């Protein structure tokens, strides 16, 4: 019996990371010596591990985490978590002397504009990303503000910081993105940087690094970076910034 | 009324980050527009923000987070969170070809040896750190293993990785640390690096970077770093490692 448990555990442990689809299809349940974990507990650990960048490059969330993710997003914890992160960014900003070329960089999707209306129709990340469907949704220009980020955005503006939006959205979405930002309450910005489809970069991390390098060359001081993806926050050319990771338990962009 | 609320909020927002003691003395309650957050919700956000490195350099946890932290540590979530992080480290390790000079670096306190027995007598981080009392406790040599890390340690050893313990404990604790590690089930290691009190470094981050530089010079390949503090995981000379952040909602070491 002990050997069998060991064998099962070994197969589980070896098989898990080999799945291209990451967590989705593989049962997370493992004999642990302290009993089975409930989905709620396991998925809270999944979520924490995503936020602390311990779980990376997952293509879908585990199937058993659909309901816990839904509960998290729609309950008060997600908003509280967003609030705490935005507060920290504001506290940090409010302690600084503001120079005229100081910028805060914000991502767009799931940082200032919520894409939860899209994801709630697509299993909160359990389905693999479908660019066509997602683009259709983006092109509606109907994404609401993430309210805690909107508050922080307004506070940073009133402190005198300039705002740069830096997104992986392609340039053909410029008009709809501008309109959506304004509709959601983000009325002003120093720059809105979308991705030139001719620009070849290996991933979002290097694209965002390259765009930040441009900003530094233009004479801006990057004071803070706020995003829902680690690829917004890691990489080069971060200037003297502190970075702030907003919660996103639904997907990962490399 | 609206103005009054705004004024209170402004005072709260400005006053909060000015406290030397960080979160402790200041009421976290704020009018948010979506109702008051309970301590449970706020402290879960505090914890998440600490793990994702959004909250830094706190000297004590907020007073209202003592009970939620106690519940978290003593409930199954803390252990589940530790398990998930250790699993990720193992999955990552198991996909690599092992070279004879490949090492995993582990911290000691709250990474392999639990200091929860100490912290549960000191408010789970609500009291400012008392080096004398903590040293007395360390010198007992009675710290238990963190069970999920112990499992992972044994698995990494059986994959063929070498283990280096790198700790901010001072060199005078070498004997008690060796004995405590063995007593807790950590029977072997490639190196156990404690801090030379004559070595002056500005903080733990630079101390750990310097020690890693030594390891790289000695020809080791740093494959993974596992610690409960961001100062274990950030900084220079990380080789080709992936890093793994174990949960610690109780204190922060710069």
From Swiss-Prot, chains A, B:
Glycosylation positions in this chain: 130
Tissue spec: Accumulates in the stems of developing soybean seedlings.
Source organism, top-level taxon: Eukaryota
Propeptide: 21-35
Signal peptide: 1-20
Single GO MF descriptor: nutrient reservoir activity
Alphabetized UniProt keyword annotations: Glycoprotein, Seed storage protein, Signal, Storage protein
Summary of the function given for this chain in its UniProt record: May function as somatic storage protein during early seedling development.
Family from the record: Belongs to the APS1/VSP family.
The protein, known as: Stem 31 kDa glycoprotein
Species this protein is from: Glycine max (Soybean)
Gene name for this UniProt entry: VSPB
